Amino acid sequence: MAEITREQVVDYLSNLPVIQIAELIKDLENKWGVKAAPAAVAVAAGPAAAAPAEKAPEQTEFDVVLANAGSNKIGVIKAIREITGLGLKEAKDLVEAAPKTVKEQVSKADAEEMKKKLVEAGATVELK
């Protein structure tokens, strides 16, 4: 039996009408007991394109951390009391112990609002 090259097979299949190729695929699936499915193609991307794919899911809960009370401690204490509902002594102790977590696991919107109030009072705030 003469050996047929891969190139000859490709040339032969290239000249067949699409209908005959579809029938050939069905015949091969039946003979081999497999199902033809589109192959997942892996595309090599450059580092710039890979960065978005590696991005972690967006964080939904944040800890509001008072990093530094700044020079207006009284204003920051008032803001802490408003945000947390703490008493005067507890709020003062929290402000003086900075860096300290003010609230844990709050939504992004609430965390941003708390940060805004504290920054307006003169504090340095981090969202973690």
Curated annotation (Swiss-Prot):
One of its GO terms (biological process) is translation. The keyword Ribosomal protein applies. GO terms for cellular component: cytoplasm; ribonucleoprotein complex; ribosome. Keywords: Ribonucleoprotein, Ribosomal protein. The keyword Transferase does not apply. InterPro entries: Ribosomal_bL12 (IPR000206), Ribosomal_bL12_C (IPR013823), Ribosomal_bL12_C/ClpS-like (IPR014719), Ribosomal_bL12_oligo (IPR008932), Ribosomal_bL12_oligo_N_sf (IPR036235). Belongs to the bacterial ribosomal protein bL12 family. HAMAP family: Ribosomal_bL12. Homodimer. Part of the ribosomal stalk of the 50S ribosomal subunit. Forms a multimeric L10(L12)X complex, where L10 forms an elongated spine to which 2 to 4 L12 dimers bind in a sequential fashion. Binds GTP-bound translation factors. Forms part of the ribosomal stalk which helps the ribosome interact with GTP-bound translation factors. Is thus essential for accurate translation. NCBIfam families: L12. This is Large ribosomal subunit protein bL12. The lineage of its organism: Bacteria, Pseudomonadati, Myxococcota, Polyangia, Polyangiales. The gene is rplL.
